[in-house]
């Protein structure tokens, strides 16, 4: 679904066959690669992380390259998260992005009970990092521990990772030359997830307020009532809320994700710095109550 939304953001106006699927490339290929990154970031595992798994530790792990390994790790993370284990620095990134401290990559809280203001701050930090990366402020060799953004420091400051290791581990030189587009695609993924009911609970937009930054403006989406956390959700129900049918139900609303995404593409093309464009992001992820606790929403998993 992310590919279709992204192609529509890049002004694909056709039907599903035109705007979705592997052959739909209205958006730049590296942007689409970045959109996929949040769900399937490439990574390698230390010996203590891969014990007992069917993973080739010397090779980059992605769903496409090591599907059995990937699925085994995902199910292990799922079982442990259901027992209220938490994942963070020192754990494999797959555990962290779906069940741990990096759930903000999907516009979600890292745990039930996390205050909306905390999740919002993490998401805004990621938007800042990925926007600045998309504008060429960092290079492949920039070490994440040297990026002075609190969410990046908290997530990756313990490591020697570079942007190369984060975004393009195991990739060829072609994708690495398009680092800026990869980063922008990752930003769009988080934006798109902030419209999915399994990720957030938003008010309906009235269409009367606008998000503005310089010459860029669009109708403001509804404010966020609650961020959800994935740990105790029913995955099938979550998946239904991520479906094309769910997207199309909100596609005509003012401030929808395609309208907002197009505004961000225009802002990037205009060369807007983070300091100039940040009001747009603050508007898009505005929250109703700063202390609203995260939870599974209407997607609670049944008790085992």
Question: Where are each of the predicted segments found?
Answer:
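N-terminal, motif-rich segments that launch catalysis or mediate targeting to/interaction with membranes
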Residues: 1-182, 197-304
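Catalytic glutamate of the conserved HExxH
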Residues: 186, 190, 194
